[in-house]
Swiss-Prot record:
GO cellular component labels: small ribosomal subunit
Disulfide pattern: none
Region Disordered, residue ranges: 9-28
Gene name per UniProt: rpsL
GO terms, biological process: translation
Protein name: Small ribosomal subunit protein uS12
Amino acid sequence: MPTINQLVRNGRKRATKKTTTPALKGAPQKRGVCVRVYTTTPKKPNSALRKVARVRLTTGIEVTAYIPGIGHNLQEHSVVLVRGGRVKDLPGVRYHIVRGTLDTLGVSDRKQGRSKYGTKRPK
């Protein structure tokens, strides 16, 4: 416990919040190029084949990003937009690919929650 005099001299240090998305360098999104598109299995108790992509960002950093939604058109050399947001059951996946921008198509036949999957309004 510091004395009043010590607090007057130095004050309290503010606890700095550690960023969860260091590769974005403080930006909301970053553009990148897919290096490898593949599937992985989630950790216990879940079971699936989750679609992920290894993306080289414009900052030069390579990250693993999750491809949300059912079906996708991504392949090697696709240009994608990457946002923050981890996938809880995939260790090491701390980023999401934004659907409906750049080379990523929106999810087809989607009626609800369309904005999250880059789908246009059905006629």
